[in-house]
């Protein structure tokens, strides 16, 4: 399911909705088109977000990897402190919303 978390141990699915009141964090990098696209998509929907720059910061890359169970590519998106996914999941989420 797009835009959701799956907890294998409990076999439950939690749907994450992005609203204008959501706390959204985007791990991003300079000069990387997928990051720019994710940020533009959120902005076009009126969603404020904190951009966490991983370029030149091993500390931020490690932080992101810890929060995403090892993912080290960007963008990585969190909504209300829950892992949402990357650009592909964000695009799919908004396609389902239309």
Language model segments and positions:
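Thioredoxin-like thiol-disulfide oxidoreductase module
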Residues: 53-72, 96-97
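Short alpha-helical
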Residues: 33, 56-59, 85
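Non-catalytic, surface beta->alpha helical segment in thiol-disulfide oxidoreductase systems
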Residues: 79-98
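Local sequence-structure signature of Cys/Sec-based thiol-disulfide redox active-site neighborhoods
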Residues: 11-50
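N-terminal targeting signals for export/organelle localization
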Residues: 1-8
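Structural micro-motif
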Residues: 68-78, 87-88
């Amino acid at each position: 399911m797009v835009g959701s978390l799956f907890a294998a141990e409990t076999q439950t699915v939690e749907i994450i909705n992005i609203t204008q009141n959501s706390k959204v964090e985007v791990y991003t990098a300079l000069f990387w088109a997928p990051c720019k696209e994710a940020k533009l998509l959120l902005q076009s929907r009126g969603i404020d977000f904190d951009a966490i720059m991983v370029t030149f910061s091993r500390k931020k890359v490690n932080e992101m990897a810890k929060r995403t169970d090892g993912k080290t590519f960007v963008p990585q998106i969190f909504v209300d402190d829950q892992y949402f996914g990357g650009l592909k999941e964000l695009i799919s989420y908004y396609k389902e919303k239309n």
